[in-house]
């Protein structure tokens, strides 16, 4: 009984689409990352420049405008997206366009944006998994076939090619169309546009107009052979522009293409254009172009002014216009060998077009940008003669023009207009680019692209004279007689000079190729000032990226700040900081222009002396040190401090105490005392919480009343007279907020034009209503109902189900996000330290001029720690009374909120992510505050004190990404990292890397003398491999060991090997397995290397270079060495070499002596031992999994069991669970299989068969599986009896960490019987009751299978965590159906997540 939980979502972008989605005028980018849907908006941002000149001509402007991506919403999908398209529909809710998504297994989903919910709304889901379409035994399964989705540019219909030759056609209603499907009639007049709705299957006729309930008509499925009987092997299809009826082009062949049969099947591709008659469900062939090159693989429809279609092949580009006229260009020397089609020769470019992505750059010129699989960019230019294309020219972009921005292959692209284009990648970061163009002709300088008509005419005139020479070649219609006019690539006049630069990027850590654990290196010397640095026991390092983008990624489950200094802080309970201006009180200058000497930073520490007394110690920050500051007038009565801040443009320091408010000057001399008691009744009152926003102070008193103070121009405080409702109200929490985004300001119509942001006061009443007041006029802007019901949407309407409510302790309105784009969020804190995050948005209602304030609930699956003792519970209660949420306006250029206590956490958000809760490394944080202006290295840092009486000055770790649920740091290597291992003795990492290199046949081969006569300039590429040593102190390469040509690194492992047969000494070694790949006709060989990372004399300027690889042993073997593992207790290793698995021992002479072996079958890619047991698994890529045992007296390998399903093993790992032994296997279809070795089961034939217990679809292609120990989570510690002996047994549990090519990281956890029953019932309830994005079914997506007897289906942890996102009433309702308490379910959810990895 196991549970699969996705810890990190996929990060590689698979699809991208530009669409006006949120509104009719919005600029949105929709991004798909395998099974995650993200909706971005393009935001124009003003960036600051620090002077300088451009080419010495003119000074730069102070600010420059750039474009950034801002995430609107994110949705995990229960399906794998295979394509996306945009569709114009009738009467969308947002006014924008709809999104059509195609999923694996022949599903289509139509979604639109719902502005009232600030999210997507599913319009329809279409299934095409009918049995009659896939009944043929020779037709492959739908999941094994590719799919193509294309939508007509006028959105009249969509075609979906699934299976092999099945074509689904989905018509859409459009204004003024003449659609008649079956019995449907549609007549629409111009006056009826505002009254058109949707249509589902029956007409609702009323007088002279037809009203539809859905935007689509009935779809139908046709075989492609119904269009043309010769379409037997479809390749690609796409709808074309500038046709009155829906028209698309199909690229296909009548016989299967084959490079091996190229002489017989040369030029076998056809391109045919069909127009659809939706009324008759028929098609008409408009044109057909035969005998096209056999390596064409894609159709790209081109908009005006070029028009037609571009056909992309491995060696050429072919353009076909609407009349069927073709223009082609060959881009390497193989184009003339593989095809007799007429094309212009640009073979000197030597381009490889496999896996390329093409996107048009401008609607005016028709230029295209081609991104190759290497990441290099090529500009494609069409010579236009009026509306006719007279030629194609290509020019690679140089590096100085941005041609090498993409480090690896692109997977998708989107044209965003205004000189912007987006390229998504699965192997590197996805980038948003901007481009500018300049003329390449110095004689005739051309203006920028704004003048469309003149540019197009000039391009035609300039290129006409040159292209006349090649006119005959370009218009030749007989492919049998090639006319290859050779033209150097440099002569591409008419091709403009484009310069690209990066505007923004989406970080990607995929594909994750290998993973290992290592000890974190201390980058700071442990001096007297550094008492203790909180860090994890181990760190998780993964090899990520492809090609030049290869590198490492450091994964941290919690934030480990860079500590600059730490101090002993005995009995310190709180820390505050205050920055004052030392000048004459001039207004603050921007952060970029401030000078440190103009400001002074105070640090105030609070030490309790009695239950109601605290001593305040004042220090001045001097770089990284704290110097005591004498301030006799600062809190002389030792009252308890509630809040400290500054007012009057940082000229006054304000200290809010329980009984009074004290105001000080910049030298902390007392300026004013303002009492907290009620002046009307003279009753003694005490302050409970406070909120500061210059020039106001909002104080909440112990009788739940509000006190509002305002500072005048001189800094003196005076109480603001409140209106009757505010003064008489009983409040639970108060907060002041400057509305920079103007979201709250737009909720009430106003006649005056706002020139600056406004200040708002948020009050949470005792009955949990949120009142929004504008200051200074105290106008009530909005009242949000049912806050404690925690519904998905908070608005002015009371939730329908409001009987069950959560007990809230605090509500805060604060900015979250990056400094250039903070957005307001409502953060609610419950009594149990649960954090609920809402994002504010303004929803518009038709017929009203102003908008309404609403809040949408953000996902937060981080559970608070459960306290384990009465002492901790008591300290937690004291903290909750005195220490509230801390608002951090700017910490490392991020606006954040911090929650102190046992679950000390930051709430962080970047522009490209949702809010995430990151734990601060450590157990208990008493107080935290911003620490700024000390030194450049500590700018925008923070200072905090923990339960170990340590005060630390630190900042967020540098170069760390907070876009995901874990803190990530990417380290570039510049080469693809295929394997890595941690050398424990030297505390370094050894990488197996590779880079592309040209391959040439050896001239000295005696068996093949004909190789010497080969004349070729376009050489094939192979991977040149090497070993590198990386120091974790600086994350730089300190040593390298190159391997021979055609020798590939297949495995790198760290092992504790016996190095002497006489002394039996054992040392830590790095074992490397390689394979020599000389070609399929030459038997493969391999080699086993044994290295030791030794200590050497370092470079004085580089002290980290004190380690080097030393070759200890080397053994050439027959067959490729594909997998390695340590085995047994004598320091031996087991290697998969060819079709054998052999146990070897290292001899003193460096050779590896075989002692035992086992015959395998095809290709062994997994060999692992359950450490210390001698039991091992061997996974074959084709023939399944073997479970064997190794014995040392005598040396032999024994087969215990084998799976009977012939699984295609991609990765495998043991998973012990008590007295049961499970084996997890990931196959090539993204499935996870659970096998069990149980010789007592009759079905196992005395253990000869591994029993298949369950099957689970992960949705991601697994790359590694790693068995990790599991630590007890806080709920298990709290429930465990300290005197019980079961504590030790609970800690002996394991988890399996799974990485994938998409960048996702998952974990499989064994679940006890009682918890499994609860979670299984909860999963069934959530599957049936939740509204799933795009209408998908999680149960069908996971395709959970089990043997039905002893086996249980695997649980979906991500689906279970959605229970936390529900409203309080529904949450309790489902818990009651499951028959469990809320704390039981939370404890179960904590156990299946990442909390069990307490050492990371």
From Swiss-Prot:
GO cellular component, one term: nucleus
Keywords of the record: mRNA processing, Nucleus, RNA-binding
Keyword RNA-binding attached: yes
Region listing for Disordered, in residue ranges: 436-472
Gene3D superfamilies, per database record: 1.10.150.910, YVTN repeat-like/Quinoprotein amine dehydrogenase
Pfam family, one: Beta-prop_RSE1_1st
InterPro entries: Beta-prop_RSE1/DDB1/CPSF1_1st, Cleavage/polyA-sp_fac_asu_C, RSE1/DDB1/CFT1/CPSF1, WD40/YVTN_repeat-like_dom_sf
Biological-process GO terms, alphabetical: mRNA processing
Superkingdom in the source lineage: Eukaryota
Keyword match Acetylation: no
Molecular function in Gene Ontology: RNA binding
Cellular location(s): Nucleus
Family: Belongs to the CFT1 family.
Function: RNA-binding component of the cleavage and polyadenylation factor (CPF) complex, which plays a key role in polyadenylation-dependent pre-mRNA 3'-end formation and cooperates with cleavage factors including the CFIA complex and NAB4/CFIB. Involved in poly(A) site recognition. May be involved in coupling transcription termination and mRNA 3'-end formation.
Protein's UniProt name: Protein cft1
Organism: Neosartorya fischeri (strain ATCC 1020 / DSM 3700 / CBS 544.65 / FGSC A1164 / JCM 1740 / NRRL 181 / WB 181) (Aspergillus fischerianus)
Lineage, opening ranks: Eukaryota, Fungi, Dikarya, Ascomycota, Pezizomycotina
Gene name for this UniProt entry: cft1
